[in-house]
Amino acid sequence: MSDIDFGYTKDHARKGANAKLPEIQCWENQYKRDYDIRIELPEFTSVCPKTGLPDFGVITIDYIPDRLCLELKSLKYYLLEYRDMGIFMENIANKILDDVVKACKPKKAVVTGDFTPRGGLRSVIVAKYEKK
């Protein structure tokens, strides 16, 4: 292991993870059977909490609804709040998943953040939830 200190702190790591964001609204699912819903935001942006530089990527939300479906306009406003937020990519995928699960309580959900390469490294973060 290298002894190089890259200057990351616990504050950097936690930044944005507990941010208060607009509520994601839902509407009543009309079907009892399982079916898949995929929502993509191809122009997602946020800010690196350490460098202040913008991060770009594609956020994909896949879920199997239970009683509720996500309302897209409120979801869009929710996702736009990340634009000026300092938050690590790993926290983005996990926070979105937590907030989606809290809002609509799906049977299953996966949030994928596919971020534009930075320094030659591409990051794809996949956060998963399955109702027990």
UniProtKB/Swiss-Prot annotation:
Output the Gene Ontology cellular-component terms.
Answer: cytoplasm
What pathway is this protein a component of?
A: tRNA modification; tRNA-queuosine biosynthesis
Record key words, sorted: Cytoplasm, NADP, Oxidoreductase, Queuosine biosynthesis
As recorded in UniProt, its EC number(s) are 1.7.1.13
Look up the coiled coil feature and give its residue ranges: none
What residues form the catalytic site here?
C48 (thioimide intermediate), D55 (proton donor)
One GO biological-process annotation of the entry reads:
tRNA modification
Q: Origin, by domain of life?
A: Bacteria
Q: Could you say which residues bind substrate here?
A: L70, E71, L72, M89, E90
Primary location recorded for the protein, binned into one broad class: cytoplasm
Q: Does the keyword Oxidoreductase apply?
A: yes
Q: Which reaction does it catalyse?
A: 7-aminomethyl-7-carbaguanine + 2 NADP(+) = 7-cyano-7-deazaguanine + 2 NADPH + 3 H(+)
The keyword Transmembrane helix belongs to this UniProt entry's keyword annotation:
no
**What terms describe the molecular function in GO for this protein?**
preQ1 synthase activity
Compartments, as annotated in UniProt:
Cytoplasm
Per the record, the similarity remark reads: Belongs to the GTP cyclohydrolase I family. QueF type 1 subfamily.
Report the protein's function: Catalyzes the NADPH-dependent reduction of 7-cyano-7-deazaguanine (preQ0) to 7-aminomethyl-7-deazaguanine (preQ1).
Please give the name of this protein: NADPH-dependent 7-cyano-7-deazaguanine reductase
Which species is listed as the source?
A: Elusimicrobium minutum (strain Pei191)
The record's gene field reads queF
